[in-house]
From Swiss-Prot:
It is found in: Cytoplasm. The lineage of its organism: Bacteria, Bacillati, Bacillota, Bacilli, Lactobacillales. It comes from Lactococcus lactis subsp. cremoris (Streptococcus cremoris). It comes from the Bacteria. Removes N-terminal dipeptides sequentially from polypeptides having unsubstituted N-termini provided that the penultimate residue is proline. This is Xaa-Pro dipeptidyl-peptidase. It is an enzyme of class 3 (hydrolase).
Amino acid sequence: MRFNHFSIVDKNFDEQLAELDQLGFRWSVFWDEKKILKDFLIQSPSDMTALQATAELDVIEFLKSSIELDWEIFWNIALQLLDFVPNFDFEIGKAFEYAKNSNLPQIEAEMTTENIISAFYYLLCTRRKTGMILVEHWVSEGLLPLDNHYHFFNDKSLATFDSSLLEREVLWVESPVDSEQRGENDLIKIQIIRPKSTEKLPVVMTASPYHLGINDKANDLALHDMNVELEEKTSHEIHVEQKLPQKLSAKAKELPIVDKAPYRFTHGWTYSLNDYFLTRGFASIYVAGVGTRSSDGFQTSGDYQQIYSMTAVIDWLNGRARAYTSRKKTHEIKASWANGKVAMTGKSYLGTMAYGAATTGVEGLELILAEAGISSWYNYYRENGLVRSPGGFPGEDLDVLAALTYSRNLDGADFLKGNAEYEKRLAEMTAALDRKSGDYNQFWHDRNYLINTDKVKADVLIVHGLQDWNVTPEQAYNFWKALPEGHAKHAFLHRGAHIYMNSWQSIDFSETINAYFVAKLLDRDLNLNLPPVILQENSKDQVWTMMNDFGANTQIKLPLGKTAVSFAQFDNNYDDETFKKYSKDFNVFKKDLFENKANEAVIDLELPSMLTINGPVELELRLKLNDTKGFLSAQILDFGQKKRLEDKVRVKDFKVLDRGRNFMLDDLVELPLVESPYQLVTKGFTNLQNQSLLTVSDLKADEWFTIKFELQPTIYHLEKADKLRVILYSTDFEHTVRDNRKVTYEIDLSQSKLIIPIESVKN
């Protein structure tokens, strides 16, 4: 078990004393160490009679004895306060060593009054075995009163806002878009959950088109057939222009202003990180945007009309937009309780909306926490001129997602009024996204946030799984690289798939975000010493490390051929039985592919030395095929039996993370380290007619040509004895169209190479 603390802010001794005093620990430097220990335990909500101090004495007996307090005894007691079990989790008498091996913060100096006070200060900042830092656990147990005012410790807000007194309001914000050209600004329903307090509150906002309901049946009916032939394209250049939808002014009309919303709500999905912040004095707002239940408009899916319908909420919080108590617009309501500062949170589509909102430069958006977000929708549904479904969702496209999230149709009255217009616009979207060619076009350009990163004012916190094949790592990498030099940004890169990481045992993620949000949203100094990149190592249990950048400038080139004359070949076509089997379950295909049982070329590469991949691996291939259209798929495995982290979390302990005071309990989870025969490092796909994003070229049958394309970026450490397996093939039954033509691909390995960006030891 290893704990990684990134949230701890260094404080000088006077600051430590002042903060301890605020918690009720009022000590003098003239006290001896045992007196301070005794008072610490008395003031805490822990049961000191249950604690063991030495191999022979419990704490009560130790405090009465003449034995001096030393660091070994300190850690015997401290580990128990951190929920470790003596004689089972750790051995009494070896507690100091156990704490050090667990990477717990320690004072490495002689035992003095000042040092013991500092040790208790940092112990309160330390993560418990069950996932909360000690001070937060004790506050949830009643160390401080629920007075609905801010209390801070180590630059973090504590849970002193009463979750039983939360206000839950429903409002409609006037957006600056008219997505169906009705001649009226679209109204957007929002749900607010906020502590009852006289303080001016900041907002943690989650923009989720899923939030008010999804239409699974419409989604399933809209899915595209993947068993189609690849289209041949004529050579041409693609032209796009940078344009944004015009923001509409609201029609000025004097209305009565009220300070209370008549509509309330009780239930609904909430993000547990937002719940955590609710009890620490941050309001939560959930907004689903245009084309969703009880709002106006069409589900425009990813364009800036949708983004503006989200940022309208930030405008309202800052007095630049209007909100109403109902869709009838009879009464206006103002955000008199808000301080105007906003952070956006959420994973997947939710993180996507955060990326998009940041690129508008909207005033009041102080930072985004974008988890597994999409920075360019083309790269989610397409790749290098090829239709490419996101991992796990063959047949999905942006029109399918629109059908899923156009939740207005879930209400019968809205269905009657709006379905005909919706069907017309959905058909237009299906045509515009152009599944036949797979090429970039104006439709996708309008949904590319990367071209507007120069407008970003908010600090950017990125969370992404390097084993996420749904929203692939390039979405985070490209946004990271597109931000202007010197922009405030940090990335948490974990080894999971498409998952949240705010309830993991090994890292104090929520507390780190707490310190950042407090500084940016409550106008306090940002003293958090956070590295640019926080990386979970790929072959070690519960180990996180710091890096300077995502993407390295140094490269090595590994030839794919082992001799001067070296060729590989694979066929595209499968017999009917195999084709049907793979089409029915792409997981069967993936297993066969990784075990060299599919139509593929396999190249095993030895490494010249230990190395860490950092960035997108590039393939440079010399090949030919007996057709005038074709596509290539590539996957690279870390091949060979060894221990690796799984990409899905397992529960370590149920309902032990208290998000407030007996409020919204969460499971404690972690990625397990397990034996496996291989692990996917990266993958990529390309249409052989698309040598670049905006150029389509002719392909001549039976003629050799060279193509270069990047695979998904990653950071992955390999030892010299490890082996990389490169798999080259065409049809991928999870991602690509299932083109079963009889095409043979031949690769000249002697003129082909793998180009790997590698990390320097210094970084």
